[in-house]
Regions:
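Condensing-enzyme catalytic core of the thiolase-fold
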Residues: 3-456
Length: 456
């Protein structure tokens, strides 16, 4: 039978163990919700946008990046279906410093433009974070890349024999991420994602989750699409989904279809505490994010309003925030009349309801400038909003005559960004939601917050 002194010692030990267990649980919970720092960004987008600074110039000046089809692609077109030969295109998609990355000329020629551009942007993003790329070799750095539209070799009638060993890997979605990991010697997870138009935001969500679970210490994330053929235009034209003038008119009464485009965008992510300790730039932080699926909705490719509401609420819960803590949403907003109306209703129900009309949710879409960049869309939207935070301005969206009458705007305090709106710093952090939805049914929503002031 223990004496009184032994019992007291046992109780002290039990109390200490309980305190340590509670502390470990608190630390684990905090780690799973730690803000993720955006430490650098890189992009190639329509309108000669070759950097995040170029993207800000594009949206701040209200410039439209839609052009005719590039002459250097030598595209041919069937007579049917007819559609406008207009879209958003990156400059010089074939440009690639193969020797710099140790890629031989035959392998370079057999490698699709998306792999080439993503590899160059990965290097650029690391350098923009003031990190020497060679210092990441053999580190648990992750790569999460949304990759869609692998049409580079689809029109080949025959393949030169010297290219055959490289063509499979050069047009493989899996190697979009794998090639980055190989070239930089990275040993964290390398994952390619294809959920169609939500791919890059899904990849960013997966990278945030991996960082919070300590599966990697730093992560490159984003995605892209580069069209080697006009097949995507043909497909959407058959669906009657393309705008006659090639332009997205998000949430507008005049919306008449999607403007198709291409692009590539990456961000470099790190746990906020690690970024501060390493002295890396902190451009903004990701407070929370979520994914879900449309499931058995109205059709395989049809948007699902309740699912969109669900992913928004899940992202807010992951961030530990309420809807009125968010100032603006960078929407999916492709300019399809029904799709935009469904998205508007979801935003009105989640962000707009019970919100003061004096402080509405501001709504915009970079697709009005660039067109729908497909696999890059979510990452491009994120970069736009990071730049908006840094420039204290919400830029206007283009091609909006008036709000679509297919949405019931009186159900909530949501307003379209038909003009630029000042976004000044204040006592509480400024925040924005970023959405990406897809014909695959996979939805993503992310909560972005301005960078906190440096600690003591």
């Amino acid at each position: 039978v223990p004496n009184e002194e032994q019992l007291v010692e046992y109780l002290k030990w039990t109390a200490a163990e309980l305190h340590q267990a509670r502390q470990r649980l608190a630390d684990l919970t905090a780690a799973l919700h730690e803000p993720i720092a955006v430490v650098s960004m890189a992009c190639r987008l329509p309108g000669k946008v070759n950097s995040p600074e170029d993207l800000w110039e594009l949206v701040a000046s209200g410039r439209d990046a839609v052009t005719g089809f590039p002459d250097d692609r030598a595209w041919t077109f069937p007579a049917e279906p007819p559609y406008a030969r207009l879209g958003g295109f990156v400059d010089d998609p074939a440009g690639f410093d193969a020797g710099f990355f140790g890629v031989g000329p035959d392998e370079a020629l057999a490698t699709e433009p998306l792999q080439r551009i993503v590899l160059q942007l990965a290097w650029e993003a690391v350098e923009r974070a003031r990190i020497a790329p060679h210092t990441l070799r053999s580190t648990p750095t992750g790569v999460y890349v949304g990759a869609t539209n692998h049409d580079y070799a689809t029109n080949l009638q025959s393949v030169p024999e010297q290219l055959l060993p490289y063509l499979g890997g050069g047009t493989s979605g899996s190697l979009v991420s794998g090639r980055i990991a190989y070239a930089l010697g990275l040993e964290g997870p390398a994952i390619s994602v294809d959920t169609a138009c939500s791919s890059s935001l899904v990849a960013i969500h997966l990278a945030c989750q991996a960082l919070r679970r300590d599966e990697c210490g730093i992560a490159l994330a984003g995605g892209g699409t580069v069209m080697a053929t006009p097949h995507t235009f043909h497909g959407f034209a058959h669906q009657k989904s393309l705008a006659p003038d090639g332009r997205c008119k998000p949430f507008a009464a005049a919306a008449d279809g999607m403007g198709l485009a291409e692009g590539v965008a990456l961000v470099l992510l790190e746990r906020l505490g690690d970024a501060r300790r390493a002295g890396h730039p902190v451009l903004a932080v990701i407070r929370g994010s979520a994914l879900n699926q449309d499931g058995a909705g109205y059709g395989l490719a049809a948007p699902n309003g309740p699912s969109q509401q669900g992913v928004i609420r899940a992202a807010l819960a992951d961030a530990g925030l309420a809807a009125d803590d968010v100032d603006a949403v960078e929407a999916h907003g492709t300019g399809t009349p029904i799709g935009d109306a469904i998205e508007a209703q979801a935003l009105l129900a989640t962000y707009g309801a019970r919100r003061s009309p004096e402080r509405p949710l501001w709504l915009g879409s970079v697709k009005s400038n660039t067109g729908h960049t497909q696999g890059a869309a979510g990452a491009a939207a994120l970069i736009k909003m990071v730049q908006a935070l840094r420039h204290d301005t919400l830029p206007a969206s283009l091609h909006i005559d008036r709000p679509t009458p297919l949405a019931t705007w009186k159900k909530g305090a949501v307003r379209l960004l038909t003009d630029p709106v000042p976004w000044p710093r204040r006592d509480t952090p400024r925040r924005a939601g970023v959405s990406a939805f897809a014909t695959s049914g996979t939805n993503a929503h992310l909560i972005l917050e301005e960078a906190p002031p440096p600690g003591p």
